[in-house]
Amino acid sequence: MARCCKCPRLHLAVTVLACVLVFTEGVNLNDLLDRASQLSDKMHSLSTSLTNDLDSHFSSVGGKLMRPSMCHTSSLQIPNDKDQALSVPEGELLSLVRSLLMAWSDPLALLSSEATSLPHPERNSINTKTRELQDHTNSLGAGLERLGRKMGSSPESLSSLPFNSNDLGQDNISRLVNFHFLLSCFRRDSHKIDSFLKVLRCDAAKMLPEMC
């Protein structure tokens, strides 16, 4: 663990969490799921905070265009609620979580690059939070990979969800609308990821379904 203390101090909170996840090969399943749930909770909270920042200036336009069926992850067949998630085998549910998270690697990179020059009065805050969100997602992805090995989840079971856009538009309105829409899709998916990880944590702890 000593090497992690020498990590750069940029995004300190994220770095500490990442270091914790790196050295987890000998940690039991319950602890791994606890740590993954903590990361997913922070990730969802941060995406909610980012959405609120955008809405402070742009809710009237951005809100009208949010159609979940237009999100690039909408084709992934996932449980609609907790009861459905509880009926899915653990390995399959973890594969769904990993597939959903992996699908956001390129979109989050695009959001991070666009945030630096986004025409919004809260640009500095949005830029900082977007980079933190990307760091959280990368850390969670590393943790889920270790969870997959622990639970015997095969990489072949992961679904590929391509993202085919490399910009958010040329004019300011288009950039704001598309940034808002993409972030809204991520917020929706981050809630699912967080919920499914909590279901997995409940299963591992042998908790009663009504307590999950």
Curated annotation (Swiss-Prot):
This is Prolactin. One of its GO terms (cellular component) is extracellular space. Residues 1-26 form the signal peptide. PROSITE patterns: SOMATOTROPIN_1 (PS00266), SOMATOTROPIN_2 (PS00338). SUPFAM superfamilies: 4-helical cytokines. Disulfide bonds join 71-185, 202-212. Pituitary gland. GO terms for biological process: positive regulation of cell population proliferation; positive regulation of receptor signaling pathway via JAK-STAT; response to nutrient levels. The keyword Plastid does not apply. Keywords: Disulfide bond, Hormone, Secreted, Signal. One of its GO terms (molecular function) is hormone activity. Belongs to the somatotropin/prolactin family. It comes from the Eukaryota. Transmembrane segments: none annotated. It is found in: Secreted.
